[in-house]
Regions:
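Conserved, well-structured core segments that form or line functional sites
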Residues: 1-185
């Protein structure tokens, strides 16, 4: 996979949108480990998201893998995106997913890669099951920055990075505050 979009998250006390904002917990402890390790978490009761630890051990910051282009294993990624499809219609259903949508968004990306909770803490730089390799450079003029998607605290921080014009980049969605129900009178 060639990454096309990421979001950065700072360490304790720095970034209110980060899982480490209030310090180390059993859930976020991987983010305090060495760089190059995968921090995987379950969100909204239905999706996994994957972050790559990016600062020295003890720092507690990572980069959310938001979107990418599947460049190898396209058929496998398609099948993973259709986990409940089977039978004679499987191939037809699998082909309906446009290439650009296979890993467009953090949950789709983890499904396309086959990332699950058991990958939490995996070393992506030294031969683990999920590996990161340097790809072809993107000209700096094609890299854009802006506010992170869907976060409320720290929403104004321009730590979302994407390749301009890349069709695999997920659409920007500003955080929409939840409407609280009115108290009964």
């Amino acid at each position: 996979m060639r990454l096309s979009e990421v979001e950065a998250y700072g360490g304790p006390g720095q970034d209110p949108a980060s899982h480490t904002y209030r310090g180390r917990t059993p859930r976020n402890s991987v983010m305090f480990g060495p760089p190059g390790h995968l921090y995987v978490y379950f969100t909204y009761g239905m999706h996994y998201c994957a972050n790559l630890v990016c600062m020295p051990a003890g720092t507690g910051s990572a980069v959310l893998l938001r979107a990418g282009e599947v460049i190898a294993g396209v058929h496998t990624a398609r099948v993973r995106r259709m986990p409940h499809a089977d039978g004679p219609d499987l191939e037809g259903l699998v082909r309906r997913i446009p290439d650009r949508d296979l890993a467009r968004g953090p949950a789709r990306l983890t499904v396309a890669l086959g990332v699950v909770r058991e990958h939490n803490g995996s070393d992506c730089c030294s031969g683990g099951p999920i590996q990161v390799h340097e790809g072809r450079p993107v000209p700096s003029g094609q890299v854009r920055t802006g506010p992170r998607t869907g976060v409320s605290a720290g929403a104004e921080t321009p730590w979302r990075f994407w390749i301009d014009g890349d069709p695999t980049v997920s659409p920007y969605r500003a955080h929409v505050p939840r409407r609280r129900g009115r108290a009964a009178s």
